[in-house]
C-alpha cells in the first residue's frame, strides 16, 4: 500500500525519480514494471503492473456509454519500467495532458499513485480545504 506525498522534479527528458521508500515495493510487487495513464481530475495515475491489470479489466467491462472513458484510460496508458536509477519516463503526451513541466507531486493513494503538477495540486488542495468537509465526512471521527 502506497501513501504519503513527495515533491519531485522531472528531468529534461521527462523522467521522475521514484522515492526510495516506494522503489522496493514496486520491485517486489511488479518487478519495476508500472503503467501510467490519465486521471479525470487532470493528473496522472501510476499503477504497479499487477494493479493496472485489475484496473484495466474493470475499465474494459464498462458499458458502451462509457466508451470515451475507456479510450481515455486505456488509450492513454503507457507501460514503463523503472530504470537502474529508480526513475520512470513520463511520455510527452501524458506530460502535456497533466501539464507537467518540472515540479511535480507524487501521492500514494493505496494501490497506486497520482502524479500532479505541483502548483495545480497546491491550488486544488487549498480550494478543497476552503470548501470544508464534504457530507460524506461529516460524521467521520478524527
From Swiss-Prot:
Q: Which CDD domains match?
A: MraZ_C, MraZ_N
A GO MF label:
transcription cis-regulatory region binding
- Keyword Cytoplasm: yes or no? yes
Task: Note the Pfam families from the entry.
Answer: MraZ (PF02381)
GO cellular component terms, alphabetically, are: cytoplasm; nucleoid
Write the record's keywords in alphabetical order, separated by commas.
Cytoplasm, DNA-binding, Repeat, Transcription, Transcription regulation
Protein family per UniProt: Belongs to the MraZ family.
**Subunit field text:** Forms oligomers.
Question: Which protein, by its recorded name, is this?
Answer: Transcriptional regulator MraZ
* Phylogenetic lineage: Bacteria, Pseudomonadati, Pseudomonadota, Betaproteobacteria, Burkholderiales
Amino acid at each position: 500500500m502506497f501513501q504519503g506525498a513527495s515533491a519531485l522534479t522531472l528531468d529534461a527528458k521527462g523522467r521522475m525519480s521514484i522515492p526510495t521508500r516506494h522503489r522496493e515495493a514496486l520491485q517486489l510487487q511488479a518487478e519495476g514494471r508500472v503503467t501510467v495513464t490519465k486521471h479525470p481530475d487532470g493528473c496522472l495515475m501510476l499503477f504497479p503492473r499487477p494493479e493496472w491489470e485489475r484496473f484495466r479489466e474493470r475499465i474494459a467491462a464498462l458499458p458502451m456509454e462509457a466508451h470515451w472513458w475507456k479510450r481515455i484510460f486505456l488509450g492513454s496508458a503507457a507501460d514503463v519500467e523503472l530504470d537502474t536509477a529508480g526513475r520512470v519516463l513520463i511520455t510527452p503526451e501524458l506530460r502535456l495532458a497533466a501539464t507537467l513541466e518540472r515540479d511535480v507531486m507524487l501521492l500514494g493513494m493505496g494501490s497506486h499513485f497520482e502524479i500532479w503538477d505541483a502548483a495545480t495540486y497546491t491550488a486544488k488542495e487549498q480550494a478543497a480545504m476552503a470548501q470544508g468537509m464534504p457530507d460524506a465526512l461529516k460524521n467521520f471521527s478524527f
